[in-house]
Amino acid sequence: MKTCKVSDLFWVNYGVNLELNALEQDMNGINFVSRTSNNNGVSAKVKRISSVEPLPAGTITVAGGGSVMETFLQMAPYYSGRDLYYLTPKVAMSNEVKLYYCHCLRSNKYKFSYGRQANVTLRDLQI
């Protein structure tokens, strides 16, 4: 099977790095995605911040620390916590293809146990 670097397929960006405890929760607000492995990475819904544009729906989130390599396709705009990366496809991809790559990324989780983070190596990771 042929593999390629994550950065060959996706633009790899660091999220907006917000702290949930500094935000106002709002049941009808914007998803707040963190490094959790639960609920598609969404840990709360928060009030929109006028000075911060939410990250776009259709991107893939990857935890660089915490629950390292927890990877999810985000179906709605969202804000992100610390050590969270988001991947934007370089070419058009269906949601099914994005979900496949979520699985490929998550299958590399074993490489980052015992406190190792994926923050430096994510772009060059072979999938």
Could you tell me what each predicted segment is?
Residues C102-N119, D124-I127:
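Intrinsic, low-complexity N-terminal interaction/targeting segments
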Residues Y14, N40-G41, N108-S113:
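Short loop/beta submotifs within extracellular cysteine-rich repeat domains
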Residues K45-R106, T121:
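A short beta-sheet element
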Residues V16, I30, E70, A76-P77, ...:
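Flexible, active-site-adjacent loop/turn segments at secondary-structure boundaries
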Residues M1-E19, L23-N40:
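Non-catalytic DNA-recognition/assembly elements of restriction-modification systems
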Residues V16, N28-V33, G58-I60, D83, ...:
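Structural beta-strand/beta-sheet cores of well-ordered domains, especially the beta-sheet scaffolds
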Residues N21-L23, S50, Q74-M75, G115:
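Short, flexible, glycine/charge-rich loop motifs used to bind or transfer phosphoryl groups or to couple energy/partner
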